[in-house]
Amino acid sequence: MKLQVLPLSQEAFSAYGDVIETQQRDFFHINNGLVERYHDLALVEILEQDRTLISINRAQPANLPLTIYELERHPLGTQAFIPMKGEVFVVVVALGDDKPDLSTLRAFITNGEQGVNYHRNVWHHPLFAWQRVTDFLTIDRGGSDNCDVESIPEQELCFA
């Protein structure tokens, strides 16, 4: 099956998580007016008694054509990925309880100035780079037992 890749926007992505960006977002000044603070851009949730981790993930580019055959989700915490050098990347997401609901399967491409924060329990494809090795600032939950993986029928990503 073919899955069309769409431009990422907060409106289109809102059921799956948050788009982390400054474009069209409110800010306030701090540090004697030298800094614009774009405050609270994503809902970060960490359940149970684990801690929030800030990491850097170095992702390798995926082979083309890109075929999706599994999704994962994290029931105990959100997961955010922010490219550190302005790279474009692709995300694949779906809703669903015990298994991904393929009627909600969507693919999005960022504009190079966006990150994403997956809500808890949102099915998504594991992180990969789009066109070159990409470093992602990653904010997620430490601890174990927070990753469910499900196979899905193969989906080939299509770029318009």
From Swiss-Prot:
It holds the Pfam family Ureidogly_lyase. It is an enzyme of class 4 (lyase). Its EC number is 4.3.2.3. Pathway: Nitrogen metabolism; (S)-allantoin degradation. It comes from the Bacteria. The keyword Cell membrane does not apply. GO terms for biological process: allantoin catabolic process; purine nucleobase catabolic process. Keywords: Lyase, Purine metabolism. GO terms for molecular function: ureidoglycolate hydrolase activity; ureidoglycolate lyase activity. It catalyses: (S)-ureidoglycolate = urea + glyoxylate. Catalyzes the catabolism of the allantoin degradation intermediate (S)-ureidoglycolate, generating urea and glyoxylate. Involved in the anaerobic utilization of allantoin as sole nitrogen source. Reinforces the induction of genes involved in the degradation of allantoin and glyoxylate by producing glyoxylate. Homodimer. NCBIfam families: PRK03606.1-1, PRK13395.1. Belongs to the ureidoglycolate lyase family. This is Ureidoglycolate lyase.
